[in-house]
Amino acid sequence: MASFDFVKAYQWNYRPQIPKRPAWFTEWPGGNRIAVTFTIMHEWESKPGWATMRRFPMPPNSYHTDDFLGLGAREYGANFGIWRLLDVVDKHGVKATVISSGLTAELFPDTVREARERGHEVASHHWNQTLQPPSYNTKEEEREAILKSIAAIEKATGERPLGYMSPGPRPSPFTLELCAELGFIWNGDYSDSDIPYTINVNGTKVVSVGYVRPAYTDNDIMELGLSGGLQQLKDEFDAHYEEAQRHPMKFRYSMHNFTGGRPGLAKVFDNFIDYVKGHSGVWFCRCVDMANFWLEHEGR
């Protein structure tokens, strides 16, 4: 069985014990060879936030710490970028996973509500991007933030999210336990495997559906320019597709509403979907679809 024990693998001295490919895993649903998942990061952060730290710190003698350029980017993502990305996947008839901060769902409930109405999955991305789980002192502090995110998404969409990804993604030693306790069936934090796998968290199974960086997010390709970024995505997909002829593979591309949602990178995404659709044996799926497929074979 392609699962492993949470206590052994996820401890302070993290040493992965990722299982080998299970014998039953010979194909994806429909006999497909490669699963392709698109995730849209629908993020928000409170001041001063990561936006400040990513560019440069505010002057130490500044009378305020508001990074209006960085915070404005988040406004752009929620008001324009998310809609552009949803329109791209809808154009191609592909369903995506929107990974939303709870605060985004609270401030812009129409975005996650309509995403769900269009058939896309809405997963939790913690409460906001400013506070990473490792910054919490206790498991209960992290639990409270995740519960706030769940409540905001459920209020906006009418459904409780089934997937979770930490900001960063930088989970804490408590994160997987909280995912299991709070009813999440998948987690997207770990970039340690080419395929999904189940994690046995104190008797509850959580499916890991992470991705391996670099080159799998808009942040990884944006410095290459639009044509260079598209070529990088094609090259990465080609490598996965070639290997998928020997054994099933997964490919996940992730976009942020405030970067990948800009016209240029959104067009790169549009063209990339066209390219992928030109290949046979491709299963376009949401993260929850992949997790459910895995649990159907591994047991819940």
Per-segment meaning from a language model:
Residues 209-228, 232:
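Positively charged, amphipathic and often flexible ligand-engagement surfaces
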Residues 2-163, 168-207, 230-253, 260-300:
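Catalytic alpha-helical scaffold of carbohydrate-active enzymes acting on polysaccharides/glycoconjugates
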